[in-house]
């Protein structure tokens, strides 16, 4: 834990980490029912030399069966209220601010991304803060609380987005992914959008395309 006021967080640094060097930073948020360690393993696959990865734990504890603990950013489905999202966004931002202060990344090279519910958070916490983030990564996700989101971003600068989805996704349908992409298109976002013949998951092809996108954006 970075300190008591922020979310528990896994920090992944390059192997030969030099605290005097100004690295980029990537904030990665896990999905509903998962935990902060879930996406940390992607760090060396995405780029193992140029970035510090910040993987916060979602704030809401939940039981996911077999005695296992999981975590959520906000209540799922129809139970989600705008206040739930605003609270999660605030908690996330406190944690990101702390990590930025501690690791001193290149302020013009900070990205935010997430998988599933973490992708929803990316839209609400990342696309609303073009003053902080250079680009956004939305993996197998969809937009929730559309009005809350569009009210905030309508007059903001639009950061580039990498977005991917599996055509066989049974958790968040490919239609929901495509509808979200279309809405973001309408608001002027530049999106690299990829579909893969996969379920609700992240595959090597996703990482390969994401690496290419990061190198160009």
What are these regions (language model features)?
Residues 34-35, 61, 144, 170, ...:
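Active-site loop signature of alpha/beta-hydrolase-fold enzymes
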Residues 57, 113, 137-140, 164, ...:
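Alpha/beta-hydrolase-fold catalytic nucleophile elbow
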């Amino acid at each position: 834990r970075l300190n008591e006021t922020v979310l528990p967080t896994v920090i992944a640094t390059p192997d030969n980490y030099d605290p005097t060097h100004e690295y980029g930073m990537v904030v990665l948020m896990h999905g509903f029912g998962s935990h902060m360690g879930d996406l940390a393993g992607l760090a060396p696959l995405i780029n193992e030399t140029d970035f510090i990865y910040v993987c916060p734990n979602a704030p809401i504890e939940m039981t996911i069966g077999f005695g296992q603990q999981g975590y959520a950013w906000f209540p799922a489905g129809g139970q989600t209220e705008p206040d739930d999202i605003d609270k999660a966004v605030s908690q996330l931002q406190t944690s990101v601010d702390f990590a930025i202060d501690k690791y001193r990344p290149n302020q013009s090279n900070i990205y935010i991304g997430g998988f599933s519910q973490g992708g929803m958070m990316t839209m609400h916490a990342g696309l609303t803060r073009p003053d902080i983030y250079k680009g956004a990564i939305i993996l197998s996700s969809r937009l929730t609380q559309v009005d809350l989101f569009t009210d905030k971003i309508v007059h903001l600068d639009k950061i580039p987005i990498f977005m991917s989805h599996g055509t066989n996704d049974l958790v968040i349908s490919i239609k929901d992914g495509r509808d979200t992409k279309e809405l973001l298109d309408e608001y002027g976002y530049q999106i690299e959008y990829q579909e893969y013949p996969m379920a609700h998951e992240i595959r090597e092809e996703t990482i390969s395309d994401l690496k290419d996108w990061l190198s160009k954006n």
